Amino acid sequence: MRKTPMAAIAAFALVAASASAANVKVTPLGTHDGEFCAQDRALVFEDPNGTRILYDPGRSVAGAEDPRLGKIDVVLVTHMHGDHAGNIHIKDVNQGECGKPDTPVSSMPKSLAVEVALAKKSKIVTGSEMQAFFAAKLKANGGNAADSMLARYGGSVTVGGVKIATVTAMHSNGLDPDYIGGPVADAMKANGFAGYVGEATGYVLKFSNGLVVYLSGDTGITKDQETVVRGYYNAKLAVMNIGDGFTTGPAEAAYVINDLVKPNEVILSHANEPGTQGGKVRAGTKTEAFMKAVKIPSHVPLSGKTMEFDANGKCVSGC
């Protein structure tokens, strides 16, 4: 039986829709629409089965009611620095400059991560001793302490069909005393102390379509990027910090990608600069330097622009 042209078109559309449904969607939530800005950290990963993971809400999410969030099943936090856990944040997008956005809203002493988890009734997944900290914060603010879940080094948890494993990140993780408050916090600040909540972490996510993603968090160069992230997990897509000073810079980050992790593609993160203007990479930036140094396709996380990746970490839409 020969198909009519309309039947053939319908069949093609069905195949295309099925292929798209098997992809992982990644949506950056930055401070300025269509740009990659200095405080941009947050990404939303959406599994083909609908599970949505907010990675490091930081300062670029406009509170728990930010309409860009939608449903959030998991809040994933790499460490407790304010630009990742969220000590302050924007009130709305496109306020201030890309290099210095307005962040007038405080989330202390809870953190934006906790505020989002409470509002969305989502889990918070962390490694090291951060799990106990978030459990206490959730309980103190009317939530369920059990919603703070631990994936310690070498182990993993699965939430909504997505496997989350903790990997090494070489970075500090001091807890700002303002998360504690009161005379204890005052004494800590007066003496230059930060609280201990364990080591900073990176993560490896395995989605239901088979895609394995490495999330660097804030890190330097580590042997585990080769032996664990590539050797064991075989990550096909990476999200890599490039900001320098606090983390690997463009050259170091490119070495991690080219020689250690060796994914098929990479998304830039944590540039600490206005990396784009009008959606185009600015000349002379760390963003440009990294993209020139890596040997694989690299993608700038333009705020609000959804990218789709197949099981091999290849961008098939939005890049």
Tell what function each PLM region has.
Residues 1-8:
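Bacterial N-terminal signal peptides that target proteins for export
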Residues 8-16:
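Bacterial N-terminal signal peptides
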Residues 17-23:
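Sec/Tat signal peptide C-region and signal peptidase I cleavage site
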Residues 31-114, 173-193, 219-233:
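Pre-active-site segment of Zn-dependent metallo-hydrolases
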Residues 34-39, 61-62, 81-86, 126, ...:
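Active-site environment of divalent metal-dependent phosphoester hydrolases
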Residues 54-58, 72-88, 124-128, 214-219, ...:
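Active-site neighborhood of phospho(di)ester-bond hydrolases with catalytic His/Asp-centered motifs
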Residues 58-66, 186-259:
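Active-site-proximal loop/helix segments of hydrolase catalytic cores
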